A protein has these predicted regions:
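Feature captures hydrophobic
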Residues: 1-113
Length: 113
């Protein structure tokens, strides 16, 4: 497992803990299924499936179709996961981009905050 993959795995663990303790978030995600790609613009990227509040099939490589795609360099993702780069600053400076519906963007904000 490379360094970025480890950071993403830790973020998934935090997400699972957040879901376990937040009943409102569980209810909000109960009927949601999304394919998610983490596109490292300088590498092959990662993917997972958000399925009714659970993250499944986290792996290296991108899914052929995804409702949510996050784009950044490997370094910027590492800085985001270590807290050295704040998500809103990364987005405002276009170091973090995403392809997703507005509803999904708002859900992502809840999950990473």
């Amino acid at each position: 497992m490379d360094e970025l993959q480890g950071h993403i795995a830790k973020a998934i663990d935090k997400f699972r803990a957040k879901i376990a303790e937040d009943e409102n978030l569980r209810k909000e995600l109960a009927d949601i299924t999304r394919n998610v790609n983490v596109d490292t613009t300088d590498n092959e990227g990662f993917s997972f499936i958000l399925d009714k509040g659970e993250i499944k099939d986290f792996k290296k490589g991108k899914l052929p179709t995804a409702e949510i795609t996050l784009h950044a360099t490997t370094l910027d993702f590492k800085l985001l996961f270590t807290g050295e780069l704040k998500p809103m600053k990364a987005w405002a400076t276009k170091r973090l981009k995403f392809d997703a519906s507005l509803d999904d963007v708002m859900r992502l904000k809840k999950l990473i905050s």
